[in-house]
Amino acid sequence: MPLRMIFMGTPEFSVPTLLALAGAGHEIAAVYTQPPRPGGRRGLDLQKSPVHQAAERLGIPVLTPANFKDAADRQTFRDFGADVAVVVAYGLLLPEEILSGTRYGCYNGHASLLPRWRGAAPIQRAIMAGDRETGMMVMKMDKGLDTGPVALAQSVPIDGMMRAGELHDRLMQVGAVLMTEAMARLESGELPLAPQAQEGVAYAAKISKEETRIDFSRPAAEVHNHIRGLSPFPGAWFELDIAGRRERVKVLASEMSEGEGDPGEVLDHTLGIACGEGAVRLTRLQRAGGKALAAADFLRGTPIAAGARIA
C-alpha cells in the first residue's frame, strides 16, 4: 500500500523529492513550507517558496506556519493521520510533538555523509574544506541536530573544480532517488536503521556575511576552495577601486595558478592573484548589479593592471 505522508521543505533543492514521491504513487496529504517572503525588485511582493509553488501545481494542500509553538498547529499536523513525514531543507526546527506525530516518524534527506557536516550549510562547507567526497543520507530524525539513525546513503565525488551550485544540483537529484527508495523500503517493512558513527563529527554552520570576503593571505588552495564553495550564492568577493570609489566584486569561479607576490597582488593581465602561498586565477566575476562575466570580458569593461592590489 502506498504511504500517506506529509512533505516538509522550502527551497528548490526540495522540489525533486516532492515530485518523485508524488510520482511514486504515495498519498501526500499536505505540504508544509515556510511562509511567503517579501521579494520582487522592490521587495514589495510576497513570493511563495519553490516547494509551495510545486505543491499547488500538484493540487496538494499547503500549510505555512511560522513555527510550531501554537498547539493548534501541532494538532493540525497530527490530524492528517499520516504514516510518515518527509523533511528536505524545511528550515524550521521540529518539536518532539511533530517528530512523533506520524506512525513512522520523520525522515530527513540531508546533503552530507553524516556525521560530517551536521547543520545548515553542508554543501558549501564540504567544498570550502576541500573535501573530495560528500553525499546524501536519509535518516530518521530525533531531537538532536542531524543526529538520528541513518537509513540509506549515497556518496558523490567532488572534483577540484566543482562549485557549490553544481554540487547542489547533483545532490538534489540523488536525494530524490534515495528518498523514494527509502519510502519504498519503509512501506515494505525493510528499511534498515543504523546509529551514526561517534567519530568524524563536523558542524556546517550557516554562512555568515563576514566570512564571504576573500582573504588572499590564505594559501591558494584554500582561497580557491572558498570561492567555489560560495559560488554562485552568496558569492565570495573582494573590493576594488573603480572610478574613484570602492566597489565589491564577486568571484564566481577560479583555478589554481602559479606566481609569487604580496597577497592580493595582481600578477598578470589574466587576473592571476598572489596568495599567502601560491596563486589563483580569477576566471568569472560579477560587479554589483551587473552580469557574471568571464575574466577577459570583465577586464574589457573594468581594467585591472598588473601590480594592482585587491583585498
From Swiss-Prot:
UniProt keyword annotations, A-Z: Protein biosynthesis, Transferase
Binding site for (6S)-5,6,7,8-tetrahydrofolate: 112-115
Lineage: superkingdom: Bacteria
GO molecular function: methionyl-tRNA formyltransferase activity
Keyword Transferase found: yes
Pfam families cross-referenced by the UniProt entry: Formyl_trans_C, Formyl_trans_N
Signal sequence annotation: none
Record's GO cellular component terms: cytosol
InterPro entries associated with the record: Fmt, Formyl_trans_C, Formyl_transf_N, Formyl_transf_N_sf, Formyl_transferase-like_C_sf, GART_AS, Met-tRNA-FMT_C, Met-tRNA-FMT_N
Its EC number(s): 2.1.2.9
Catalysed conversion reaction: L-methionyl-tRNA(fMet) + (6R)-10-formyltetrahydrofolate = N-formyl-L-methionyl-tRNA(fMet) + (6S)-5,6,7,8-tetrahydrofolate + H(+)
Gene3D superfamilies reported in the protein's UniProt record: 3.40.50.12230
Function in brief: Attaches a formyl group to the free amino group of methionyl-tRNA(fMet). The formyl group appears to play a dual role in the initiator identity of N-formylmethionyl-tRNA by promoting its recognition by IF2 and preventing the misappropriation of this tRNA by the elongation apparatus.
Family: Belongs to the Fmt family.
PANTHER family cross-referenced by the UniProt entry: METHIONYL-TRNA FORMYLTRANSFERASE (PTHR11138), METHIONYL-TRNA FORMYLTRANSFERASE, MITOCHONDRIAL (PTHR11138:SF5)
Protein name: Methionyl-tRNA formyltransferase
Organism: Rhizobium meliloti (strain 1021)
Source lineage: Bacteria, Pseudomonadati, Pseudomonadota, Alphaproteobacteria, Hyphomicrobiales
Name of the coding gene: fmt
